[in-house]
Amino acid sequence: MQFNEIYIRCLGFQAPMSDCWDNVIVGMKVEVENTDCDNFSEDFPDSFWVASVLEISGYKALLRYEGFGDNCSKDFWVNLCSSSVHPVGWCATRGKPLIPPKTIENKFQDWKDFLVRRLTGARTLPSTFYSKVQDSMKSRFRCDLNLEVVDKNRISHVKVATIEKIVGKRLQLRYYDSQPNEDVFWCHEDSPLIHPVGWARRVGHTLDAPPAYVDRCSKGLRDKDDATEDLFPMGMKLEAIDPLNLSEICAATVKQVLNDGYLMIRVDCYDEDPNLVDWFCYHITSPCIFPIGFCAKNELPLTPPKGYLPNTFNWNEYPCSHWFCSSDRPMHKFTTGMKLEAADLMNPQYVCVATISRVVDRLLKVHFDGWEEEYDQWLDCASCDIYPVGWCELVSRRLEPPRPPNSVEG
């Protein structure tokens, strides 16, 4: 499906498994629980069978048990990233038998031969798929860390807050002076609304903080629970003139952010130097650095990262977590009508069923299903507040359903 293929793999850097979704295709085979079975025993309380992926939408897949042919009566949806979905061979490694569904158990005399024929040459999930799911949802932050975050009630200020909870890389933050019964603030860990301890003082931003916090920041002192700069990653991708070969524009990476807008940049076409001598300093306003897609837009040759061919390199297929912000970023493939799960930025504790109602360049107009258009929100195509279908289920977070027709606020 378009949503799965484009969003999770190419643009959903904040979505778990975005870097390995190429392994998930229609037609692949998996082993799942057989719910159409009564052949249980004490040794095998669960029954499993092979199923084919018929359709993919976000993390969700429509499956059909092998042997049903064109019969869709037992088709069912699952979250492919859940622990109940396994690669072919999983049962064999655990000594579990594969038992055909009761509805079709007499359809073939030799089920083993049937499976061999159906599985020969078929694709399945990698054996490490589920462990990668778990790894992809790990946050680089931890609970009890202190941060500086935009004050939701006075957005011209930042305020000291503490991480209370982490769900799927979304952080639940409590301001230092909040009462226990007051609302918390939610945002993604990659949100531009949060900053490390000491950020406001360094850049001259207005800060609301306890006197003891201000005092130790002014003295350069750190607490064990302070969020530090290393939790706010470098790694932004851009295109830059090669300082060692001024005739070429190359794929490059921001390796370090210095004060006053200076960046340490490394050109990606060379072997990485362990002594960091291949880093070069550019100012963020330098005419020698460009947003992703600059060369393509202007029909200029781009020297790709090492290991990639110039004629086939595509930024949308290159694994990177951050992009140099510009409207010139390569065009996404979101389209009107696509379904997703989106945080309501006016009430970011809620993640809701939503639809893309309009696309203008890199901007997406997100409509919350069941609500009036006045509640629509414009989001960037790379926003960390939009997710594929099935994300809430994956991270065990409540998904706010569409508002029922004719419901009244209040």
PLM regions: where:
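Eukaryotic chromatin- and chromosome-associated nuclear factors
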Residues: 1-410
